[in-house]
């Protein structure tokens, strides 16, 4: 038993593996029909009997040659090259190479990139960039300016003269003049009338124009009514009361004492004190030189003083310390 023995498997052989019984049978229906049409053994099928006369057989390929190649064709590589050259020559004669001497071929075929991008289904360029990328529509001077080629002075002068002449011709041909029967004043008067008619058509009637004034008056009345309501409201009254208390606290106990002295029945009234203070201020202001002239009284705040019967003014400010308020004790 060898080391490389194959695994056992069952294999069935037919009685006629090559099917020779069918091929050797002359009583087949197809063969009879072909014989009626003129075919016989040893002939090929087809109008010219060019078909295969033998059965198809499997051939073993044990070399590196191409399919169908034999040892007889190995030395015929020069003939293959000649056949290839003949094929190229036939193609050149059919399509016809362009000669270099012909003047028509010297002219370059120019095409518009913009038109090509419009015609083509696929987008070649964006529409706003096609004009900039298309150089076929540019002249030689434009291309020279782009690529920086120098030109002779004579050619430049000739080009300038030609361009000026062309510009003059185009300016003469393209000038357009318009004449109107209206003067400037009539034109502007007509325009103003049109604008007024538009504004009148767009603006509402006189009733609508009067409504804003009445609305403003009503708004002012509502504001005044709201102000009076705010003044009479309890919150506003409470705020005023707090403000009054704050002012009295800032004035201090001395001012309160002075008010109490003024309100005593034996003491002078506030009007007399104020009159006396005003007279004293006027005496101070007047000088002996200007007694005849009446000077303008200066506005000054005079301290309130008590005047005794003897004419001596006494300050009502107490020397003692301020009186403290008694706190209420809840029981």
Swiss-Prot record:
Residues 26-72 form the G-patch domain. One of its GO terms (cellular component) is spindle. A motif (TBM) lies at residues 291-301. Keywords: Centromere, Chromosome, Kinetochore, Nucleus, Phosphoprotein, Telomere, Tumor suppressor. The modification Phosphoserine is found at residues 233, 269, 274, 277. Residues 1-28, 156-175, 197-331 are annotated as: Disordered. Residues 254-328 are annotated as: Telomerase inhibitory domain (TID). SMART domains: G_patch (SM00443). Its main location: nucleus. This is PIN2/TERF1-interacting telomerase inhibitor 1. It comes from Rattus norvegicus.
